[in-house]
């Protein structure tokens, strides 16, 4: 596995400055250096240069075509045209394979090993995993190798150069995304409105309960004060009423005792005469 590299624009800027004044064979050589340079994975600015486009109609048309394959294509595209394109160095092969993984990751985030092995023309899983680890170290993608399920799970990947014919599809995708955002926003606003209504209802109910509690407290307070006032007007009279029994009760009790006594004395007298 090669040393760790990071995707930066520093090397690319240097190549762009050199390419502005280069032509012919010198420019073709510079393009091959760009394709091999670590950390350079976008080539759109280089392709847009007029002197680079002139290569398409020159003896170095194959170099220009190779540059377009690195910008927009995959390793399978290169193999399909390999007879008409310059040979690749090992570093160029790995870079184009990295870009091919990025293209696959743009379509699906869980890529089976079998798909990768075929797309990258690799012989075994060990080579595939080494290539993916190298791409991760280069910050081309982030993810994990699921060896149990034999697949690559991609969390992030860099963007690739965009062709002009792809702009309409991108605009359509963005338009659909905007429509989806509007639908989500409308749903959120509706939920917020319902939440505010529920909040107002609960506040009204709370105020009503607090008002009823306050009125109840006032009623209890007034009733208690009135009872206390009534008790404190003549406390001695109130105590007397509690201590003295009712007049009707006192009159009935002695009469009962008297009748019982007379009955006993009368019966005694009758018993004496019989004796």
Swiss-Prot record:
**PROSITE patterns per record:** PCI
Where in the sequence does UniProt note compositional bias of the Basic residues kind? Answer: 254-263
Among the record's GO biological process terms, what is one? protein deneddylation
User: Sorted alphabetically, which keywords does the UniProt record give?
Assistant: Acetylation, Coiled coil, Cytoplasm, Host-virus interaction, Nucleus, Phosphoprotein, Signalosome
Localization, per the record, is: Cytoplasm; Nucleus
Q: Which residues form a coiled coil?
A: 185-233
Q: How is it modified after translation?
A: Phosphorylated by CK2 and PKD kinases.
Bias (Basic and acidic residues) ranges: 235-244
SMART domains per the UniProt record, alphabetical: PINT
**Tissue distribution:** Widely expressed. Expressed at high level in brain, heart and skeletal muscle.
What are the residue boundaries of the PCI domain, all occurrences included? 2-159
Cellular component GO terms held in the UniProt record: COP9 signalosome; cytoplasm; cytosol; nucleoplasm; nucleus
Question: Could you tell me which residues carry N-acetylserine?
Answer: 2
Give the matching InterPro entries: COPS7/eIF3m (IPR045237), CSN7_helixI (IPR041481), PCI_dom (IPR000717)
Q: Where is this region: Disordered?
A: 227-275
Role noted for this protein: Component of the COP9 signalosome complex (CSN), a complex involved in various cellular and developmental processes. The CSN complex is an essential regulator of the ubiquitin (Ubl) conjugation pathway by mediating the deneddylation of the cullin subunits of SCF-type E3 ligase complexes, leading to decrease the Ubl ligase activity of SCF-type complexes such as SCF, CSA or DDB2. The complex is also involved in phosphorylation of p53/TP53, JUN, I-kappa-B-alpha/NFKBIA, ITPK1 and IRF8/ICSBP, possibly via its association with CK2 and PKD kinases.
Q: How does it assemble?
A: Component of the CSN complex, composed of COPS1/GPS1, COPS2, COPS3, COPS4, COPS5, COPS6, COPS7 (COPS7A or COPS7B), COPS8 and COPS9 isoform 1. In the complex, it probably interacts directly with COPS1, COPS2, COPS4, COPS5, COPS6 and COPS8. Interacts with PMF1. Interacts with the translation initiation factor EIF3S6. Interacts with CK2 and PKD. Interacts directly with ID3. (Microbial infection) Interacts with vaccinia virus protein C9L.
> Family per UniProt?
Belongs to the CSN7/EIF3M family. CSN7 subfamily.
Q: Can you name this protein?
A: COP9 signalosome complex subunit 7a
